[in-house]
Structures are given as structure tokens and as C-alpha cells.
């Protein structure tokens, strides 16, 4: 007897009347006149398959006691369903109970509405819900599409280090990595902590970005990307921030900001097309329960050409909009989410690439423009969320990079390896960063980024 996934069984590609076996968990059960109708899911798709068991089965009394969350193996004949909303069902010849739910009354995942706040408290069980099953499959689809896009376009995937000595953003919000005894810290003659006695012989941290490391490979392999976990010790309790998240960071050699923007547009549209093509069932559920525009917004995004606007012009538009914003709009201040959303939703009505930001609000590695006041930076703004991608052309001139590092108070000797790229065959190059969880939030229409990752890490929250 063939073991098949629920997705395969429902797809209509198996012979009707053939014997199949499915393995999964009970979503719901209802009984009627000697019959038990068991909705079984295995996570392969959104829809469950109905297993129909009758009272001729020797363990029918046991089957009737099944509750949501119990695991089973069902064997039987695959037939067209007589009920509405389902294509096929299984007429069971056997149902073996593999695992019972200890106490159905206290089982946290009940077949009823549950708030996201409650589900975060049981994050180890929430993938069993319809919502988090859908989010997880979409997250997987996006991750697979990321690698596929870059592979098809000639990029090499680079595994950048998680433990580092460098602050790629220059913000200082990093998690320290140490094996020193926190109760009896070794001290040097000045009384400072003696990190030479630590595991790596120096101060080390969890990475905030793989960009600096991946640039090294860009300047040898031309087109590269990294896709991995990053960490920010930012004491932020908003719905938009995580302490641990995943970043996608491509880097292209012999490229300027315009080429960087084109890559970002092609990349996002490829990802959204993949989700529409591969996860229509999950998007349909999200459109019904979470975000009614879940499908329409992705289609609109794909079909709309990106608008490009200079930061200076964006500030003027915002100042002349007549709209009262919570945060001030002045040249030299970073744009806030409310400003970004006004530009992309109310004024332009499609994705926007804002370019050439004031140099003092952007990172030290961004290329200084000829005006000496701005850098070749970009933010891609999407309707409904604001910034979704941040990128720049990198500073390839050693003297300018050194001046920028001095301006930011960074020790150039500490970044000597990064400066080497500008000493040996330097070329113009560019790249961007896309927070993977922010992408999942946008696609799924979630209101809190903590629901876009399996086990959220945030200030005061590191369970599981």
C-alpha cells in the first residue's frame, strides 16, 4: 500500500479506487450513524483529507475517541468525495492510532479562534494551527525561491560567520560571545576585562550582518549572496523588530546603485510570483482570515514598475503634502514608516526606490556622492509596510572609506581586512539587505514580526 502525502492524495494525480496510506494528525472529527469523519492533515498543504471510518472496523470505538491533535495512520481506498469543498477522501480499511492527546480539555491547540499573543506562549505547538501551518509553508516557499533565483542568475552562496569581531553597521548594538566566568572576570592592569584570556583571545560578538564578509567574495567571484541568521541587541519592543532574524544579502561587482535597484526589483517580483504559483491554497486562507489583499497586493506589486525618487525630492513632497505626521520631516532626518507609506501608498501608489540619502544617517561603507553630502544608498518601499529592502553602492575608494570610518569613530586597524579590498584590485560594487522575516510579514499580511519566525527572540523573550 502506497504511503502518500495529503497534498498528493488531493491533487487528483493518483488513480481513483487505488489503495493509499496517509500519516498525520487529526484536525477535527465528527460522527454520524456508525461513521466517523476524520479530517487529517500532515502539513504538506493547507487542506486536510477526510478519512471515512465505519463501525465495521475492529477499533471503531477507539476511533470515535480521537480528538484534535491525535496522530494516526489511515489506510484505505482513495475515492472522489461526495461532500462539498473537497476533491477526494479515503474510505478507511484501517485506522491505527499512533499517539493520543493526553488531556483534550487542556490541550492548548483547540479547534477555535486563538489570539496570536496566546500562540506565542505556546510557540512549540502553534505550527499545528491553520495560520502557522500556512505561514510556515509560505516561509519555506520564499526561502527556496531565494536560492533558486540566485542560482539561476549565476550567484554563489557564501556562508558568512555568525561569530565576528566587526560591527558591520557601526551601531554598537551587538550580542557579546564569551566563555569567561561572569562572576570572576579576568582583569588587565587598568582594571578592564582582559579579553585576551577569552576563547578567541579577543572580544567577539554575534554578527549583525554578513555584508562585510560577503564583499570579500564579491570581489573575487563577481556575484554572491549570503542568507543566514543575524542578531541585534536593540532593546526594542515594537511589532517590527526581532533580536534574531535572517538576512538575505546579495553583492554584485562592477555595479552601481542603478544596477543594485534593478536587481532588487527583479528579485522581489520573482519571489512574489513563486508564492502565487506555489502556495495559492495558503494565500487564499490568509486572504480570508488575515489580509483580504494578500493575493491582490502581490499581483499588483509584480505588475507595477518601480518608481525612483531622490531623498531630497521625497522630503519636499512630504513637507508639501499637507498631511500631519507624528514624526518631523526635515532634510537630514531618516524617513519614518509613516513617511514611507505615504509616499508609496498615497502619493505614488506603487513600489518606490528612494535614493541618495544624507551621508550622516547611513552606514560608513556607503559610497559618498560627488556633492559630499549624500551617499549612493537606496531603500525600496512597498505599499502596506514601507521599507522592505535597504542597499547601497559600496565605497570603493580607500581614502574616502578611511575618512568615513574616522567620521564614525571606527578604528581602521580593526577593519584592516575590509580595507584590503580597496588596496588590491578595487572595483565599484553594490548590494542590499532584505530581512527575511519582514518579507514574510509582508507576504502573509501579519501584524507582528514575531509571528513570521518559528521561535521569536526579542527583549525579555527567549523561550523554547
Swiss-Prot record:
GO biological process: asparaginyl-tRNA aminoacylation
Principal localisation: cytoplasm
InterPro entries: Aa-tRNA-synt_II (IPR004364), aa-tRNA-synth_II (IPR006195), aa-tRNA-synth_II/BPL/LPL (IPR045864), Asn-tRNA-ligase (IPR004522), Asp/Asn-tRNA-synth_IIb (IPR002312), NA-bd_OB-fold (IPR012340), NA-bd_OB_tRNA (IPR004365)
UniProt xrefs under Gene3D superfamilies: Bira Bifunctional Protein, Domain 2, Nucleic acid-binding proteins
Upper taxonomic lineage: Bacteria, Pseudomonadati, Pseudomonadota, Gammaproteobacteria, Lysobacterales
UniProt EC number: 6.1.1.22
Subcellular location field: Cytoplasm
Source organism: Xanthomonas axonopodis pv. citri (strain 306)
GO molecular function terms attached to this record: asparagine-tRNA ligase activity; ATP binding; nucleic acid binding
Reaction catalysis annotation: tRNA(Asn) + L-asparagine + ATP = L-asparaginyl-tRNA(Asn) + AMP + diphosphate + H(+)
Single GO cellular component term: cytoplasm
Family of the protein in this entry: Belongs to the class-II aminoacyl-tRNA synthetase family.
Protein name: Asparagine--tRNA ligase
HAMAP family xref list: Asn_tRNA_synth
Keywords annotated in UniProt: Aminoacyl-tRNA synthetase, ATP-binding, Cytoplasm, Ligase, Nucleotide-binding, Protein biosynthesis
Database matches in CDD domains: AsxRS_core, EcAsnRS_like_N
UniProt gene name: asnS
Record note on quaternary structure: Homodimer.
Amino acid at each position: 500500500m502506497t504511503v502518500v502525502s495529503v497534498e498528493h492524495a488531493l491533487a487528483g494525480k493518483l488513480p481513483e479506487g487505488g489503495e493509499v496510506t496517509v500519516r498525520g494528525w487529526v484536525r477535527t472529527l465528527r460522527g454520524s450513524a456508525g461513521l466517523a469523519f476524520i479530517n487529517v492533515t500532515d502539513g504538506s498543504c493547507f487542506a486536510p483529507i477526510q478519512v471515512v471510518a465505519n463501525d465495521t472496523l475492529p477499533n471503531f470505538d477507539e476511533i470515535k475517541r480521537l480528538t484534535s491533535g491525535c496522530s494516526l495512520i489511515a489506510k484505505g481506498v482513495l475515492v472522489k468525495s461526495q461532500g462539498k469543498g473537497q476533491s477526494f477522501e479515503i474510505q478507511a480499511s484501517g485506522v491505527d492510532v499512533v499517539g493520543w492527546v493526553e488531556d483534550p480539555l487542556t490541550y492548548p491547540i483547540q479547534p477555535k479562534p486563538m489570539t496570536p499573543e496566546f500562540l506565542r506562549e505556546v510557540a512549540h505547538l502553534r505550527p499545528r494551527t491553520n495560520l502557522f501551518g500556512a505561514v510556515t509553508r509560505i516561509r519555506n516557499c520564499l526561502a527556496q525561491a531565494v536560492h533558486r533565483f540566485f542560482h539561476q542568475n549565476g550567484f554563489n552562496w557564501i556562508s558568512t560567520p555568525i561569530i565576528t569581531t566587526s560591527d558591520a553597521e557601526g551601531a554598537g548594538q551587538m550580542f557579546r560571545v564569551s566563555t569567561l566566568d561572569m562572576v570572576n572576570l579576568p582583569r588587565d592592569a587598568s582594571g578592564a576585562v582582559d579579553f585576551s584570556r577569552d576563547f578567541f583571545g579577543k572580544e567577539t560578538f554575534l554578527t549583525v550582518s554578513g555584508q562585510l564578509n560577503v564583499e570579500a567574495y564579491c570581489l573575487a567571484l563577481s556575484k554572491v549572496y549570503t542568507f543566514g541568521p543575524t542578531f541585534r541587541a536593540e532593546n526594542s519592543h515594537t511589532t517590527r523588530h526581532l533580536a534574531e532574524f535572517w538576512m538575505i544579502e546579495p553583492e554584485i561587482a562592477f555595479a552601481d546603485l542603478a544596477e543594485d535597484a534593478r536587481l532588487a526589483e527583479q528579485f522581489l517580483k520573482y519571489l512574489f510570483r513563486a508564492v502565487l504559483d506555489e502556495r495559492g491554497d495558503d494565500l487564499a486562507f490568509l486572504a480570508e482570515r488575515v489580509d483580504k489583499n494578500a493575493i491582490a497586493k502581490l499581483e499588483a506589486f509584480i505588475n507595477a514598475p518601480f518608481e525612483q525618487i531622490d531623498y531630497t525630492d521625497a522630503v519636499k513632497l512630504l513637507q508639501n503634502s499637507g498631511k500631519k505626521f507624528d514624526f518631523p520631516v526635515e532634510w537630514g532626518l531618516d524617513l519614518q514608516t509613516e513617511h514611507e507609506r505615504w509616499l508609496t501608498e498615497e502619493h505614488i501608489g506603487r513600489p518606490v526606490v528612494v535614493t541618495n540619502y544624507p551621508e550622516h544617517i547611513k552606514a560608513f561603507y556607503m559610497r559618498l556622492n560627488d556633492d559630499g553630502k549624500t551617499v549612493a544608498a537606496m531603500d525600496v518601499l512597498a505599499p502596506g509596510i514601507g521599507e522592505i529592502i535597504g542597499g547601497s553602492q559600496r565605497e570603493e575608494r580607500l581614502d574616502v572609506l578611511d575618512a568615513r570610518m574616522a567620521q564614525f569613530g571606527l578604528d581602521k586597524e580593526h577593519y584592516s581586512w575590509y580595507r584590503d579590498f580597496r588596496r588590491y584590485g578595487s572595483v565599484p560594487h553594490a548590494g542590499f539587505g532584505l530581512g527575511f522575516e519582514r518579507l514574510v510579514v509582508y507576504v502573509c499580511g501579519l501584524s507582528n514580526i514575531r509571528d513570521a519566525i518559528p521561535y521569536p527572540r526579542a527583549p525579555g523573550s527567549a523561550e523554547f
